[in-house]
């Protein structure tokens, strides 16, 4: 029997959507990112590459970081989803970002890491954040902020300098991110709101 409804718990609130191609229904081809942004007006998570490569659309699903542009809403039935809007009491005063476009995805990826491993090493943080791209090159300040939140006793400047020790790839970032047609933020379907 074909599913007629999809039920999601988003930021602690339950939503039930009718599945179909009619007005007000969630089409079977609609991504979780589209549902969150268009239907629930949760625009904190961004959709930049639409390929799961940049991490801007990261949300937590059942406590794990996922790229919401790669998941169909109909496949998320019964899942518990937390968006950037659902996080409370954010750490303040670390000034890790510049333009802010990547911020929601990076924060959600960092939250997923810290849920899984509350005290990651600097190298574990670098690896966990390798799927998120910051086009303002704020990677070092992001790593420093996550190290601080994780309670690492390491000197945060040393962590930043060690990131440069590997000259071939100072911070692991997927190279295909630089080929994205949306990297400059000018595609009208991917607004900054």
Question: Residues of each region from the PLM?
Answer:
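Signature of N-terminal electron-transfer/Fe-S-associated modules in redox systems
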Residues: 1-193
